[in-house]
Amino acid sequence: MQDDIKDITIIGGGPTGLFGAFYAGVRQATCRIIDSLPELGGQLTALYPEKDIFDVGGFSKILAKDLAQNLIEQGTQFGCDVVLDEEVSEVEREGDMFRLVGRSRSYLTKTILIAGGKGAFEPKHL
């Protein structure tokens, strides 16, 4: 199998990672998002999807799940590959590239953007 080399690989599919994917697309860079969670959006979708968010420019308030959906649409509009339920456990330098080692396979990239937020998490049910 031939490796699919990306210009940028983003570790983390929360708000920062999604905006990074958007900006990569604007700059016509190929990209990939790798996230350990089963869906994009980070804490917005995993912890408090029904919470109102008040500190986002352009909105007096917006539900976290709606903000996440907007960010997902914006971040993936240029065709960024998305890999979910995958954790990067190792980074290896290979010449002028990096190999990111995950549970299921490895990924070659020219640049890494780490946007892991607080890392993998699960909500605690009381």
Where are these regions (language model features)?
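Glycine-rich FAD pyrophosphate-binding loop
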Residues: T9-I11, G25-A46
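N-terminal Rossmann-like dinucleotide/flavin-binding domain of flavoprotein oxidoreductases
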Residues: T45-S106
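Flexible, glycine-rich phosphate/dinucleotide-binding loops
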Residues: G17, L40, I62, V91, ...
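FAD-binding core/adjacent interface of flavoenzyme oxidoreductases
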Residues: M1-I11, R27, V82-L126
